[in-house]
Curated annotation (Swiss-Prot):
O-(pantetheine 4'-phosphoryl)serine: modified positions: S37
A GO biological-process term: lipid A biosynthetic process
Gene Ontology molecular-function annotations: acyl binding; acyl carrier activity
Protein family (similarity comment): Belongs to the acyl carrier protein (ACP) family.
Segments forming domain Carrier: 2-77
Domain of life: Bacteria
GO annotation, cellular component aspect: cytosol; membrane
Taxonomy of the source species: Bacteria, Pseudomonadati, Pseudomonadota, Gammaproteobacteria, Enterobacterales
Keywords: Cytoplasm, Fatty acid biosynthesis, Fatty acid metabolism, Lipid biosynthesis, Lipid metabolism, Phosphopantetheine, Phosphoprotein
UniProt organism field: Yersinia pestis
Localization in the cell: Cytoplasm
Protein's name in the database: Acyl carrier protein
Length: 78
């Protein structure tokens, strides 16, 4: 089983079409990885599906970096 971090990074690579080595924990989806607002919405939806969780809109707005996504999933896994 892959770690949460590995799974989150895999989703980011697939959703944003970036190279795996570009996906650093500190990377911002918009500034560093070139995502636009639609990309970030699709990314949140993919994370919800992968981890069978719901990310409320107010929380989704705070998920702007790779680490923020990892932290949210870690904090909200059953």
């Amino acid at each position: 089983m892959s770690t949460i971090e590995e799974r989150v990074k895999k989703i980011i690579v697939e959703q944003l079409g970036v190279k795996e080595d570009e996906v650093k924990n500190s990377a911002s989806f918009v500034e560093d990885l070139g995502a636009d607002s639609l990309d970030t919405v699709e990314l949140v939806m993919a994370l919800e599906e992968e981890f069978d969780t719901e990310i409320p809109d107010e929380e989704a707005e705070k998920i702007t970096t790779v680490q923020a996504a990892i932290d949210f999933i870690n904090a909200n896994q059953q």
